[in-house]
Regions:
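Walker B catalytic acidic pair
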Residues: 300, 306-307, 318
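Walker A/P-loop
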Residues: 219-260
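The Walker A (P-loop) glycine that initiates the GxxxxGKT/S ATP-binding motif of P-loop NTPases
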Residues: 221, 285, 307
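Peripheral, non-AAA+ core regions of ATP-driven protein-machinery
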Residues: 1-218, 222-228, 331, 471-472, ...
Length: 515
């Protein structure tokens, strides 16, 4: 007897429907074909134990299972459930009349309980696209899978629940969650606020400009000056996620297994802050079973690299291409996947190894050679891709104790959203362009062309600071954002002047340190 069940194979963010063909004949052997990895091949032992522990006997017959299409690699333990149901149906224990209506995914515990799988959301999207009536997933994955409309999604606790449902002996209702309502309710709830930070108004302004235009930013200052504190509050002034952005972000986190049981759609922009010991693979993605890295988990959000020069230079250099292309292609001998990675890079660093170069309250103990080697850890090409360089100084306690609370994030966010709306209107006819940081060279001439006085100022800065052509483009993009925040249609000299001021690492004694 031949029985077919349906499941899915996840490759990057792409999902392929997989047909599990189960055939039984005389004999006692078990055959599994279809480019299955080790975890899938081990499913026989899990299925056998689960069946026995739930009152079933493993058929004493020759079982042949083919996972079609056979040229797509099948990875992970999510095939346990469709394989088990296929074996039971071929043995007459499960009615096969409904098997073509549902997609099944789930890992089996030895006691028959269903364990969560990765990629439930993109699998649900695929099931709807293939016009399946419903999707059966482990209960732990129900909230993310139920995000998809026009698809009946059932969360099951055990193998027996699935058997009773397919046989019609027990009635289950599909899970319906008002995910959109939850999404909008949770968008504006932040634990951290800019009003917590006293002083540092110039840095807050730089962060506001960065948020308004989607610009990359680096903060340079001594220990304890508030670099990390300010960076962690950046998401509170970023514009809210759209539903489309949230869906894409949630899919990436779903594939990576980062979605908790209580989460449906990710409602706030991601903030990822990996440790400086991170490897290349962990940062950009990859591995034997390809997984998204930190740059993809930060998609539509912020990637914060604290103490940036402490990261190995080889790790930092892999950021250059993703920062330009806003996507990462990972190619290995056995696979090739692509993940989106449109993120804001926010970095912090000390001015020298001891941290106190230029600090009026501490003496720097570093030699010029040590300072130069420290600064050279960040290459010029990478630094060119960072639009805003912001110097930060520690606030003296005498001033700190007398200052009033700063401007709240909600007020700053209103200005950022207003600037982003101007940019959305400007770029509405350009596919994939949402903010000023994404502008091409051609678009700069159209939307950020400075007047004669501004061009003279910019030419002088280029010559004196020895700026690259890429730095020139970054200045124009930042100036366009500053003009948007001011509600100005044209880029004026005051906007250019402020943008040039955000090239701290290209100026004066900074440049002499070796960058």
């Amino acid at each position: 007897m031949l029985v077919k069940t349906f499941c899915a194979a996840v490759n990057g963010l792409d999902v392929n429907t997989v047909t599990c063909e189960v055939s039984m004949s005389r004999g006692v052997q078990f055959h599994l074909t279809g480019l299955a990895d080790t975890a899938v091949k081990e499913s026989y032992d899990r299925i056998k134990a689960a069946l026995i522990n739930n009152g079933f006997k493993m058929p004493t017959m020759d079982i042949t299972i083919n996972l079609s299409p056979a040229d797509i690699k099948k990875e992970g333990s999510g095939y346990d459930l469709p394989l088990a149901i296929g074996i039971l149906a071929a043995n007459g224990k499960v009615e096969d009349g409904n098997l073509d209506k549902y997609m099944l995914v789930g890992e089996l515990g030895l006691d028959g309980h269903l364990q969560p799988i990765r990629g439930a959301l993109p699998i649900a999207i695929r099931a709807r696209k293939e016009k399946f009536k419903g999707l059966i997933v482990p209960q732990q994955n129900i909230r993310e899978a139920a995000v998809v409309n026009n698809l009946e999604v059932y969360g099951m606790e055990t193998l027996l629940d699935v058997i009773h449902f397919l046989n019609g002996t027990t009635t289950y209702q599909p899970t319906i969650i008002d995910t959109r309502k939850e999404f909008y309710e949770q968008q504006n709830h932040f634990d951290l606020d800019f009003s917590d930070v006293k002083g540092q108004e110039s840095v807050k302004r730089a962060l506001e400009v960065a948020a308004a235009g989607g610009h990359n930013l680096i903060m340079i200052g001594p220990p304890g000056s508030g670099k990390s504190m300010l960076a962690k509050r950046l998401p509170s002034i970023l514009p809210p996620l759209s539903l489309a952005e949230s869906l894409e972000t949630t899919q990436i986190h779903s594939v990576a297994g980062k979605i908790s049981r209580d989460t449906s759609l990710i409602s706030q922009r991601p903030f990822r802050a990996p440790h400086h010991t991170i490897s290349q693979v962990a940062l950009v993605g990859g591995g034997n079973n390809p997984q998204p890295g930190e740059i993809s988990l930060a998609h539509n959000g912020v990637l914060f690299l604290d103490e940036m020069p402490e990261l190995p230079r080889s790790v930092l250099e892999v950021l250059r291409q993703p920062l330009e292309d806003r996507k990462i292609s990972i190619s290995r001998a056995k696979y090739s996947v692509e993940y989106p990675c449109s993120f804001m890079l926010v970095a912090s660093m000390n001015p020298c190894p001891c941290g106190y170069y230029g600090d009026p309250t501490h003496n720097c103990v570093c030699t010029p050679g040590q300072i130069q080697r420290y600064m050279n850890k960040i290459s010029g090409p990478l630094l060119d891709r960072i639009d805003i360089h912001c110097e930060i100084q520690a606030v003296p306690f005498s001033e700190l104790s007398q200052m009033q609370p700063g401007e709240p994030s909600a007020t700053i966010r209103e200005r950022v959203i207003a600037a982003r709306k101007i940019q959305e209107e400007r770029f509405k006819s350009f596919k994939g362009i949402h903010c000023n940081a994404m502008m091409s060279e051609k678009m700069l001439h159209e939307f950020a062309e400075p007047d004669a006085a501004s061009m003279d100022m910019l030419r002088m800065a280029m010559e004196r600071l020895k700026l690259s052509a890429r730095a020139y483009s970054r200045i124009l993009k930042v100036a366009r954002t500053i003009a948007d925040l001011a509600g100005s249609e044209k880029v004026e000299s005051m906007h250019i002047a402020e943008a040039i001021g955000y090239r701290n690492l290209d100026r004066g004694d900074w440049a002499e340190r070796g960058i």
